[in-house]
UniProtKB/Swiss-Prot annotation:
Keyword set, alphabetical order: DNA integration, DNA invertase, DNA recombination, DNA-binding, Hydrolase, Ligase
Domain of life: Bacteria
Family the entry assigns: Belongs to the site-specific recombinase resolvase family.
Catalytic machinery residues: S11 (o-(5'-phospho-dna)-serine intermediate)
EC code: 3.1.22.-, 6.5.1.-
Official protein name in the record: Serine recombinase PinQ
Originating organism: Escherichia coli (strain K12)
Length: 196
């Protein structure tokens, strides 16, 4: 027999889920208190990082219904929401969002709504990639170096090369510069074959 669950999330401890529970009740959903899952966690946490939501997922079975007051209860961004709804749909769980008129997100209308959300999620992802790429290009143009800082500066590399030419062992040079033999060998190789 299918059951109805509600997921109520609040961000801070000084808030309560009372308004969300009342809104669900006003929409005509009669939910047993033990089937209302309340969680005090930031909205920026992905659903996979929400212990209460994960406990809810373990209880939901095919044919059950999940009621949320707002779409953001199902994820931290459009991509996370889409993933969560898809996961619930694959399990056979109907998801109702009261902020969208109580629409069942697994119905044809709900699926269309999720396609719009998917498009927004893809747009969001593309914008993020574009901003990241342009930020990297801008930083490189400004001379910003990526990765770990070099162990040896150019002056030290030149000193290493001079010591190698004068016959000092790689191990002795590594000890002198307080670094590994491999670092000295890399510096030697770089100086022997300068960038073309």
């Amino acid at each position: 027999m299918s059951q109805i669950f509600a997921y109520c999330r609040i961000s801070t401890l000084d808030q309560t889920t009372e308004n969300q529970r009342r809104e669900i009740e006003s929409a005509g959903f009669k939910i047993k208190p033990q089937q209302i899952i309340e969680e005090h966690i930031s909205g920026s946490a992905a659903t996979s990082e929400r212990p209460g939501f994960n406990r809810l997922l373990a209880r939901l079975k095919c044919g059950d219904q999940l009621i949320v007051t707002k779409l953001d209860r199902l994820g931290c961004n459009a991509m996370d929401i889409r993933k969560t709804v898809e996961q619930l749909t694959e399990t056979g769980i109907r998801v109702h969002c009261l902020a969208l008129g109580g629409i069942d997100l697994t119905s044809p209308t709900g699926k269309m709504m999720m396609q719009v959300i998917s498009a927004v999620a893809e747009f969001e992802r593309d914008l993020l990639l574009e901003r990241t790429h342009s930020g990297i290009v801008r930083a490189r143009g400004a001379g910003k170096r990526f990765g770990r800082p070099p162990v040896l500066n150019e002056e030290q590399k030149q000193a290493v090369f001079e010591r190698i030419k004068s016959g000092v062992s790689i191990s002795a040079i590594a000890r002198e510069f307080k670094t590994s033999r491999q670092t000295i060998l890399r510096a030697k190789a770089k100086l022997q074959t300068p960038d073309i």
